[in-house]
């Protein structure tokens, strides 16, 4: 089984300024050495703004074009979410952009009502699992982290659970505990990619991006309140070996979501 090289970019975001954010991420991405997957935070081109009618881009707009260009240039998968419009709906949409310009998408399922997100975006209804180098990867977005049924992995449908976020510093204890819980209960690697900095509403995000293995052991954690890019290699053999040795999924409860 092949190892997977993941590059996590923990960055500040410029409020509602697509050009400034894409310029900053271009520099950061170009500095990454060879990597299979580069991951950006939630709403990386605008920050977490509810000004969705003004900020929403079409699927062939500036952010999507930029993602395709960068993925091709670096010969890597580039992932992150943006405010995108399709069929008269606006989504907080995760994009999995491949070097050949093809992509998959996942629309944030759980919209953060305490920030009024549910009144400015359309919720997604389908989970996404993508494949890369023999790995199966399930991307989710920020508030999705609080809902374990949505990430349930009883049949080992995926190997890496990927969360991108604009998670505030005041709730970082929950962020960290929930990331560990998702890794342990789903017997998978979990990567949490968060932004830093103060947004346009005065909310401070401290980062605390993390990579955790299926046993609940910390592989890497970013520095608080600092921009950082980290490239880490993870092993599918290690994951499968632990799953075989400790098959807790065989005793998991059955239930149906209606």
Locations of regions flagged by a protein language model:
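Active-site catalytic loop in hydrolytic enzyme cores
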Residues: 85-156, 170-177, 235, 241-248, ...
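CN hydrolase (nitrilase-like) catalytic-core segments centered on the catalytic cysteine
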Residues: 62-77, 146-229
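Active-site-proximal beta-strand elements of phosphoester/diester hydrolases
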Residues: 3-13, 17, 105-107, 135-144, ...
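Short beta-strand scaffold segments in enzyme catalytic cores
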Residues: 80-82, 93-97, 128, 192, ...
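Cys-nucleophile CN-hydrolase/nitrilase-fold catalytic domain and related Cys-dependent amidase chemistry
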Residues: 18-19, 23-99, 104-105, 168-182, ...
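Feature marks short, surface-exposed loop/turn motifs that line or immediately flank catalytic pockets
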Residues: 12-15, 46-47, 238
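Hydrophobic residues at beta-strand termini and immediately following loops
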Residues: 9, 106, 130, 193, ...
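Short Pro/Gly-enriched beta-strand edge/turn motifs at strand-loop
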Residues: 77-80, 108-116, 190-194
């Amino acid at each position: 089984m092949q190892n997977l090289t993941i590059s996590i970019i923990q960055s500040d975001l410029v409020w509602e300024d697509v050009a400034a954010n894409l310029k900053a991420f271009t520099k950061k991405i170009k500095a990454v050495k060879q990597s299979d997957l580069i991951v950006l935070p939630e709403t990386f081109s605008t920050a977490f703004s509810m000004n969705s009618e003004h900020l929403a881009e079409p699927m062939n707009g500036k952010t999507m074009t930029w993602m395709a260009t960068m993925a091709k240039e670096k010969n890597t998968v580039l992932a992150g979410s943006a405010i995108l419009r399709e069929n008269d709906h606006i989504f907080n949409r995760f994009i999995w952009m491949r070097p050949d310009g093809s992509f998959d998408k996942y629309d944030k399922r759980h919209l953060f009502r305490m920030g009024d997100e549910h009144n400015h975006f359309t919720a997604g209804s389908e989970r996404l699992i993508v494949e890369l180098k023999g790995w199966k990867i399930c991307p989710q977005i920020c508030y999705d982290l609080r809902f374990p049924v949505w990430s349930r992995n009883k049949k080992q449908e995926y190997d890496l659970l990927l969360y991108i976020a604009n998670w505030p510093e005041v709730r970082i204890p929950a962020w960290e505990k929930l990331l560990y819980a998702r890794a342990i209960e789903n017997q998978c690697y979990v990567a949490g990619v968060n932004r830093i900095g103060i947004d346009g509403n005065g909310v401070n995000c401290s980062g605390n991006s993390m990579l955790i293995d299926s046993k609940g052991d910390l592989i890497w954690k970013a520095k608080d309140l600092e921009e950082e890019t980290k490239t880490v290699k993870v092993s599918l053999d290690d994951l499968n070996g632990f799953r075989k040795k400790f098959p807790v999924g065989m005793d998991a409860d059955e239930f149906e979501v209606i």
